[in-house]
Design a protein with these regions (language model features):
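GST-like fold's C-terminal all-alpha helical module
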Residues: 106-132
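Short glycine-rich phosphate-binding loop at a beta-alpha junction
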Residues: 21-28, 54-57, 125-129
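GST superfamily/GST-like fold recognition
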Residues: 132-136, 162
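Active-site-proximal alpha-helix that buttresses catalytic centers in soluble enzyme cores
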Residues: 1-48
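Phosphate-handling substructures
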Residues: 2, 41-112
Length: 185
């Protein structure tokens, strides 16, 4: 699914907020690459090409897979099922769409990807261009939340969520949530 990158003020706002000299990662989905390119085009020094050796596409950061439902609107899905609800809608944290993932599956995948990226880049700022579900899962890791609690977060497109990894004397060991869903302007 392509990304609408026409609102240049949004990307200029992101370019002002995000750290310089950071490691860049995206998911393997095209819209994250387009978003990253738009941020660089708006003035944040960044890698070229995206994805490329300096902007890694990490499949583990992809959005939750909805399997056979991928790309369908809610109305299309409801119509295709004759108005009947699939059990996924009653317990989306643990149930899977046909051929897809549960939110718990997503959390496990995203947690592995975050540890992989963090371990390879310890001490560096990381800009991760990701998806709403991926960000909810990252917040779950940072806050030690159950999957159901993560689904309570709303993530707007192009918002900034900042997580800092902390460790050391008097700091503990883990994650600090600095901001969630901050508008880019």
């Amino acid at each position: 699914m392509p990304c609408d990158c026409s609102d240049t003020a949004v990307f200029a706002g992101l370019a002002r907020q995000l750290p310089r000299d950071a490691v860049w990662v995206t998911s393997d989905l095209r819209r994250t690459h387009e978003t990253a390119r738009a941020i660089v085009h708006a003035g944040l020094p960044g890698p070229d090409p995206i994805p490329g050796p300096d902007a890694l596409a990490i499949p583990g950061l992809a959005e939750q897979s909805f399997g056979e439902w991928q790309g369908l609107t809610y109305d299309e899905l409801r119509h295709s099922r004759g108005g009947a609800f699939h059990r996924f809608w009653h317990a989306p944290a643990h149930e899977r769409a046909p051929g897809g993932e549960s939110f718990l599956d997503l959390m496990e995948r995203v947690t592995r990807a975050i540890h992989q990226v963090f371990d390879a880049n310890r001490g560096r700022d990381i800009i991760a261009i990701a998806h709403g579900g991926t960000i909810r899962a990252a917040l779950g890791l940072a806050l030690g939340l159950e999957p159901e609690a993560c689904l309570a977060f709303t993530m707007e497109n192009c918002s900034v969520t900042r997580l800092d990894h902390v460790e050391g004397p008097g700091m503990g060991h883990g994650w600090r949530v600095v901001t969630v869903n901050r508008p880019p302007r």
